[in-house]
């Protein structure tokens, strides 16, 4: 996506990964501000699975992968030692998204 000033954002549909944010420096030279992956294979195979992608359904760690709501205990998948992290192994970072302008 590019705005009228020439600033640009590139996002993949896999995990909503931000690939590039192109902005000018003080001299008008455009550069990518994102430290991330160069291609979709790098996103999929990354040892840093949450780098520049959407996280969720929950953000951060849920201790022991469980919580209680209205007196009922829920157990979530554990993907960070004993904890549930950023939506677990099937979080938003693993989904293919549809996008419209």
Protein language model regions, located:
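Surface-exposed acidic/polar loop and edge beta-strand patches at domain peripheries
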Residues: 2-101
């Amino acid at each position: 996506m590019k705005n009228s000033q020439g600033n640009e954002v590139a996002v993949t549909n896999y995990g909503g990964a931000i690939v590039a944010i192109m902005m000018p420096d003080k001299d008008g030279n455009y550069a990518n501000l994102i430290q991330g992956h160069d291609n979709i294979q790098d996103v999929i195979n990354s040892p840093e699975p949450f780098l520049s992608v959407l996280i969720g359904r929950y953000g951060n760690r849920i201790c022991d992968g469980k919580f209680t709501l209205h007196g009922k205990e829920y157990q979530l998948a554990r993907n960070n030692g004993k904890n549930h992290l950023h939506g677990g192994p099937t979080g938003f970072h693993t989904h293919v998204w549809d996008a419209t302008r």
